[in-house]
Amino acid sequence: MKFMMMHKNDPKTEAGEMPPMELVHEMGQFIGGYAQQGKLLDGAGLGASKTRTRLTFRNGEASVLHGPYAGQHELPASTLLLKVATRDEAMAWAKRYGTILGDGEIELGKVNEPWDIGIMPPPPNPPLQILLIDKADAATEATGRTAEKTAAIAALKDEMTQAGVLVRSLNLQPSAKGKRLLFTQNVLQVIDGPFSESKELIGGFAVMDVSGMDEILEICKRCAEILGGTLEVDVRLVE
């Protein structure tokens, strides 16, 4: 079974503080073990809200808000990893995507690269990787979007792939099939789905191919220990 586990931003990451190298290496070693087993399919960390852009679509119009800002409707329906030259290029694609959706919200978050966290020096003129987060709505949380919208999104994704912009995309099943994990000093509270939008921004994610919910919960528990024992994690099934 494929799951996406999403950890939420905390005050330190939102402030742009660099994680200690010991933490980076410990988490890398832990997650790297699953990569060697073929269980880690994807993953990325996102920058603080000051590196993000929120696009809200209402009545055919798009409003744009650049960070920093607080979280509000943080429940994804799908994610698209884009490789672009500039943020404006990503915004242009996001506006086309949002026009298909109608009323809705999209967030663009810069992906943290190894040089952003001090692992290696930056290469010359690196491309910009942006995670496009398509926020859930009543349709995606129920029966899904219309066949017309689904076909139009698929056609746009094909165009983005041909343009060398879309690296990969994932669709998530409704939150009714997921769980929200609230860790407080390594004490876990589990909230079964469906659940409402989180008010905490997504700080990063990993996509795992594991035996089931029990295994992904054990992975989340260990990640929480490494990250200090107090954080929020959403676990969602991947289509």
Listing of model-derived features with the role each one plays in the protein:
Residues 1-239:
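Conserved, structured core segments of small domains
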